[in-house]
Regions:
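Short, surface-exposed connector motifs at secondary-structure boundaries
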Residues: 31-35, 59-66
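Flexible loop/turn segments at secondary-structure boundaries
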Residues: 9-10, 33, 44-46, 74-77, ...
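Active-site beta-loop-alpha junctions of metal-dependent nucleic acid enzymes
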Residues: 19, 36-60
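Structured core elements
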Residues: 2, 25-26, 36-38, 68, ...
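Extended, hydrophobic alpha-helical segments in both membrane/secreted and soluble proteins
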Residues: 34, 48-53, 68, 77-80, ...
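Acidic/histidine-rich, metal-coordinating catalytic segments
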Residues: 62-76, 91, 95, 102
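Domain-scale segment recognizer with a strong primary affinity
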Residues: 80-191
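An active-site-proximal beta-strand-loop segment
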Residues: 1-35, 40-41
């Protein structure tokens, strides 16, 4: 499991009011399944991030053995660390020497930023609820896009691997996880 915070983004309503949001991104590095959790405000606290991680990821998906995160206070703080300890998940902060260890999250953030820009420019926003609505729709679009994108290494979409169904057509998909693991290792060895 890789987690990271993205944002803050300021959404401006028609009346000039500004609303700030950020998000918690969660990616399973085995399947590349993504979930994105909307957070209020620009500087989320560790207890808030931990609570949202527990409610939005741990309540829906199998418990990960390990959680990789950067050195931000939202992950190193007591609240987030308590959630990891409660669920017996090994926390692993990236180091200065290996800052790219959480690169899987960082690459997805650029996709999300592009989606958010389009939604913010093409939607009328009147108030906080409208701003939140834009953010939720942009996040849903980004989640869907990442789940239906064919991964070069896996030769399947993350949605196909996790749900064993095509994400667009109503047909079953059987992915050979052993072959995927071997293909990944081969690519690593070649580089």
């Amino acid at each position: 499991m890789n987690v990271d915070c993205i944002g803050p983004w300021t959404v401006t309503a028609n009346n000039g009011a500004k609303y700030t949001f950020s998000a918690l991104t969660c990616i399973d590095p085995v399947t590349n399944l993504v979930d994105i959790i909307l957070l209020d405000g620009s500087n989320p606290r560790a207890d808030y991030c931990g609570e949202r991680f527990e409610i939005c990821w741990l309540s829906r998906y199998p418990k990960p053995n390990r959680c990789v995160y950067d050195n931000g206070n939202e992950f190193l703080g007591r609240g987030f660390q308590e959630i990891l300890a409660k669920h017996k998940i090994q926390g692993k902060a990236t180091t200065v020497k290996n800052a790219q260890a959480n690169g899987i999250c960082e690459r997805m953030h650029q996709t999300m930023l592009n989606v958010l820009k389009v939604h913010a420019k093409t939607t009328t926003i009147d108030d906080y609820n409208g701003a939140r609505h834009v953010m939720e729709h942009a996040i849903a679009s980004c989640i869907h896009a990442t789940r239906i994108a064919v991964n070069h290494t896996m030769q399947h979409t993350p949605g196909e691997i996790v749900f064993q169904r095509d994400m667009l057509l109503d047909i079953p998909v059987i992915a050979d996880l052993v072959a995927i693991r071997e293909r990944r290792q081969l690519l690593i060895d070649e580089n």
